[in-house]
């Protein structure tokens, strides 16, 4: 799911707080579109950190297994009502099964019967439920077919959008579309509305004469009815959680594409076909990249993407039938500034086909197994397209946005079962820190083992629901490593290490000492000590080398023999660890790093540090060589993020002005930056 509306409100409030704080770092938000840093997340002053509020939630007790939903719908558009006729097929989990509940809200139940015999059943409607009493006790071997006739007037879950005209004169057809995640499909059809039960589904959707219906699975047939309406029969024969069931109805143009022998479909408004095709054009390539990286082919029989108006999120990974906000897709097909954001949105939702649809979180506390993966896979596709520097830039952006949430809102573990509503969990911790944990896991076990373990995880758990322990097991069995420490500190605990590093070179002995302290404040969920494998890059006039250390204590000292004075010291080469780092270095060393670091993250890191040196009041007496290095990088660096960072550093005019201009730039460039607003 890509929930931009809620995310935007949250981030706006956070930015207002940041701009209000007088000690905000002078580095503007403009540079953080793609090149954000662990160093400059605003940490000098924060509001008191809170916990995410809410009560403890557990998986609901389940007494049955739903096998299939067959849903027949037509619509009373003037009254925004769904007229439904549904058959739910289920089996008891234990003997003596006499009654059960389905989730059902905002609907009038007209009849409940056994569809095989037309036997009328007793039922009542407690709040948000449909409680059904069966005609007798049933055993686990017996399949029960329950027919429910109803009329729903949903307050959520399904939406009726009238025909509108955009500011560009574009006509948007009248539409009906659904949005089930996290628990809202029960507003338009009775169901078990929790992710830990998977069933197949079938829909018969009756539309107006000039409309079509798009849904999950394969289109079996279209029937032309005597009254001029059409009925579209869709069938999804792979089991899936109920929140992934969807429909879209409207007057759409259909574009076709393919990945191997799998149909790929794009549904857009008439008159926007060229724009939509350009926006969606990389979908087959994304399918290829993900299939090859995971060594696991696209797992369904088709993939469709449909744009809708007034969508409450940016995108939603309904199984085989993704729904997108029309503005996100059409803007990406029009302007180059929006292209990266649109591609990230498309790759995010597509990757849910593996992580979220095929393999699904067992409950919402485990939702990072859906959303953290989808956010990580965005970066994996960017890496394939633009190289490892682009991938690391995505990780830096994720870190910055996670730091904003941690510093100005609340801190929580990734796996967390306290909330008011499930959607409360769909935050930067879930998406951004979740992606960063996968990045760190990749660095911990190595690239080959990482992708092999993900393949094994998918093979073992396809068509199932999962918990973090299933992922941990897949990695331990694949790599032979014990990884409980990793998951404990990064997934089940909260926060991140805050490191203070000081270096001292001893010319008499040609040795370098690094003093490392973990300074984070421990609490009930934040560890006092993180276990951190770290790479140290050391460069002298005679050459360079990489040292491997492991931090396991609050304070440690490391000594390295050198042949001469260090020209460059990189702590955590390649930015493999989520952290905040306090490591002051002289301007000459940073200027060397800006000019010579092999990876873009090292050059960005140096540019950020130099930016703070030349911003008032630190700018007094600044070495002209620093200005020269920044000017060279702003023009000549091969990576756009480095050029942007260096150029922005040269524009520093002071805290107040930089903060104000930076926030304005952040909003005007949010699409090009593909930030948190784009990927929820």
Language-model features: locations:
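N-terminal, polar/Ser/Thr-rich
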Residues: 30-83, 115, 170-175, 186, ...
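Hydrophobic alpha-helical and helix-loop surface patches within well-folded domains
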Residues: 30, 130, 234, 260-516
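Bacterial N-terminal signal peptides that target proteins for export
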Residues: 2-14
């Amino acid at each position: 799911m890509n929930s931009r509306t809620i995310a935007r409100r949250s981030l706006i409030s956070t930015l207002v707080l940041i701009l209000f704080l007088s000690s905000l770092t002078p580095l503007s938000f403009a540079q953080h579109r793609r090149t954000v840093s662990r160093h400059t997340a605003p940490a000098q002053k924060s509001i008191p950190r809170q916990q995410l509020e809410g009560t403890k939630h557990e998986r609901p007790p389940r007494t049955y297994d739903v096998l299939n939903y067959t849903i027949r719908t037509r619509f009373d558009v003037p009254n925004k009502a769904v007229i439904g006729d549904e058959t739910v097929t289920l089996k008891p989990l234990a003997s003596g099964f006499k009654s059960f509940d389905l989730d059902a809200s905002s609907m009038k139940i007209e009849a409940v019967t056994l569809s095989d015999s037309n036997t009328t059943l007793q039922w009542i409607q407690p709040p948000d439920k449909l409680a059904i009493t069966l005609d007798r006790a049933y055993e686990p071997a017996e399949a029960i077919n329950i027919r429910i006739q109803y009329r729903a007037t949903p307050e959520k879950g399904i939406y009726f959008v009238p025909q509108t005209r955009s500011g560009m004169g574009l006509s948007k057809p009248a539409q009906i579309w659904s949005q089930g995640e996290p628990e809202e499909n029960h507003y338009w059809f009775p169901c078990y509305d929790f992710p830990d039960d998977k069933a197949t589904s079938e829909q018969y959707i009756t539309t107006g004469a000039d409309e079509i219906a798009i849904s999950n699975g394969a289109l079996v047939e279209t029937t032309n009815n005597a009254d001029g309406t059409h009925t579209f029969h869709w069938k999804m024969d792979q089991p899936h959680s109920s929140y992934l069931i969807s429909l879209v109805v409207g007057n759409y143009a259909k574009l076709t594409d393919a990945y191997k022998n799998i149909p790929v479909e794009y549904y857009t408004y008439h008159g926007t076909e060229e724009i939509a095709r350009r926006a969606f054009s990389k979908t087959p390539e994304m399918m290829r990249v993900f299939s090859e990286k995971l060594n696991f082919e696209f797992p369904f029989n088709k993939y469709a993407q449909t744009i809708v108006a007034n969508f409450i999120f940016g995108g939603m990974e309904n199984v085989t039938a993704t729904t997108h906000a029309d503005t996100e897709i059409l803007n990406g097909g029009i302007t180059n500034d929006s292209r990266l954001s649109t591609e990230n949105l498309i790759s995010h939702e597509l990757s849910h086909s593996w992580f979220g649809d095929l393999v699904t979180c067992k409950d919402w506390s485990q939702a990072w197994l859906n959303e953290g993966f989808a956010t990580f896979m965005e970066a994996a596709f960017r890496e394939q397209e633009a190289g490892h520097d682009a991938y690391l830039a995505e990780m830096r952006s994720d870190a910055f946005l996670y730091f904003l949430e941690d510093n100005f809102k609340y801190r929580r573990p990734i796996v967390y079962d306290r909330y008011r509503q499930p959607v409360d969990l769909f935050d930067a911790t879930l998406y951004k820190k979740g992606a960063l944990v996968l990045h760190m896991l990749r660095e911990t076990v190595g690239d080959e083992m990482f992708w092999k373990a993900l393949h094994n995880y998918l093979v073992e758990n396809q068509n199932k629901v999962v918990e973090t322990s299933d992922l941990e097991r897949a990695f331990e069995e694949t790599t032979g490593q014990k990884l409980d420490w990793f998951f404990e500190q990064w997934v089940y605990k909260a926060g991140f290490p805050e490191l203070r590093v000081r270096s001292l070179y001893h010319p008499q002995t040609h040795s370098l000492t690094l003093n490392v302290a973990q300074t984070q404040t421990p609490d009930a969920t934040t560890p006092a000590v993180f276990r951190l494998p770290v790479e140290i890059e050391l460069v002298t006039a005679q050459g360079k080398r990489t040292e491997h250390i492991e931090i396991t204590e609050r304070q440690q000292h490391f000594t390295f023999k050198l042949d001469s004075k260090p020209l460059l010291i990189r702590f955590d080469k390649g930015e493999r660890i989520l952290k905040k780092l306090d490591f002051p270095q002289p301007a000459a060393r940073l200027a060397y790093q800006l000019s010579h670091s092999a990876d873009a993250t090292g050059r960005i890191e140096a540019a950020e540090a130099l930016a703070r040196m030349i911003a008032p009041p630190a700018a007094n007496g600044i070495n002209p060589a620093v200005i020269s290095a920044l000017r060279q990088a702003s023009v000549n660096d091969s990576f756009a993020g480095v050029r942007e960072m260096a150029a922005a550093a040269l524009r520093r005019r002071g805290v107040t002005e930089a903060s104000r201009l930076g926030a304005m730039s952040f909003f005007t460039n949010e699409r090009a930056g593909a930030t948190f607003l784009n990927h929820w």
